[in-house]
Design a protein with these regions (language model features):
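Non-catalytic N-terminal targeting/anchoring module and adjacent flexible stem/linker
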Residues: 273-281
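Nucleotide-sugar donor-binding catalytic core of glycosyltransferases
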Residues: 4-7, 11-19, 57, 61-194, ...
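Short beta-strand/loop segments at the ligand-binding rim of alpha/beta enzyme cores
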Residues: 27-36
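Nucleotide-sugar donor phosphate/pyrophosphate-binding loop at the beta->alpha transition
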Residues: 35-49, 85-90
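Membrane-proximal helix-turn-helix segments that form the acceptor-binding/catalytic region
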Residues: 23-25, 42-56
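A charged, aromatic-enriched C-terminal amphipathic alpha-helix characteristic of glycosyltransferases
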Residues: 237-269
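Short alpha-helix at the nucleotide-sugar/activated-sugar donor binding site of glycosyltransferases
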Residues: 197
């Protein structure tokens, strides 16, 4: 319902924030704290800054953007990082083993934007030639050739799946791939990474400051095609006990530290409201 009603679209005036402004004004009249969380930082900071400026509290996935926010909104508005998390009701481990001895990737591929991210994807895909990779294309419904994946004999492209079904994919495939669009942030990482780990999946990811800080002990971080080929060359023979132990430890770690309950608690502390205990994460 909020699609095209939060970000700025200068060339599409019918896409505007009028409804959002009314909601924030109504909440403020009632003394309800107004909190904005930008999960699209730092790539799309400028598309959301106008909307963010309406709020009493601003959270961002990318800590690097905090000075930019402070420059715009001033000291009266609190700005803090708020990282991605998982919903355990959807993303959680299973005792069943994997069904497919391949890699999977759930997400998009773009020829016209995010060149660095695309290079990392192509490196991972090349490394998977020994085991094959199945892609679930987030942009399968878009007709533009800019969103088409490369034509590789070991890469199979399937239509997009609902977010709630991604968990089963991470459980079903032996390996799940991850790329991070933002690499220089200690708080920004792909949400996909924590969702893979929460499901007990074996994650193979590209590097980033946040990966090094939080996830390097629970995933394989590959930095070049040679490393990727060596890793997948081993994995084609199946998972080792160390692989399984690392995946299990990753699920335990994420579910202990990276759920939406944890993030809501951070928000409530920031606005000085008591946190009601609940079994729902």
């Amino acid at each position: 319902a909020w699609k095209y009603k939060i970000a700025a679209y200068p060339d599409r005036p019918e896409r505007n924030t009028q409804t959002l402004r009314k909601v924030v004004a109504s909440a403020r009249e009632r003394g309800i704290p107004c909190v904005f969380w930008n999960r699209e930082d730092g790539i799309h900071f400028h598309r959301f800054i106008s909307s963010a400026s309406l709020f009493d509290y601003i959270f961002t996935v990318d800590q690097n953007c905090i000075p930019q926010y402070q420059e715009v909104v001033g000291p009266a508005v609190a700005v803090a990082p708020l990282m991605f998390a998982v919903q355990p009701a959807i993303h959680s481990p299973s005792t069943d083993g994997y069904r497919y001895p391949q890699a999977c990737f759930v997400g998009s591929y773009s020829l016209h934007v995010h060149g660095g991210r695309r290079n990392w994807q192509e490196m991972l895909f090349a490394g998977c030639s020994d085991i094959g990779v199945t892609v679930y294309d987030r942009n399968s419904g878009r007709s533009s050739p800019n969103y088409r994946y490369p034509d590789l004999p070991w890469l199979q492209v399937c239509p997009s799946v609902p977010h709630t079904q991604t968990a089963q994919l991470y459980r079903d495939y032996m390996v799940s791939l991850n790329v991070n669009t933002v690499e220089d942030s200690v708080t920004m990482f792909s949400r996909r990474l924590v969702e893979i780990l929460a499901c007990g999946g074996l994650a193979v990811t590209t590097p980033g400051l946040s990966v090094d800080r939080y996830f390097k002990d629970y995933s394989y971080v590959v930095r070049c095609e040679e490393e990727a080929r060596d890793l997948f060359g081993r994995l084609k023979h199946g998972l080792t006990s160390r692989d399984r132990e690392m995946a299990a430890a990753g699920a335990e770690y994420v579910l202990k530290e990276f759920t939406w309950t944890h993030r809501l608690e951070e928000v409530m502390r920031a606005i000085s409201r008591p946190v009601k205990q609940s079994s729902v994460a």
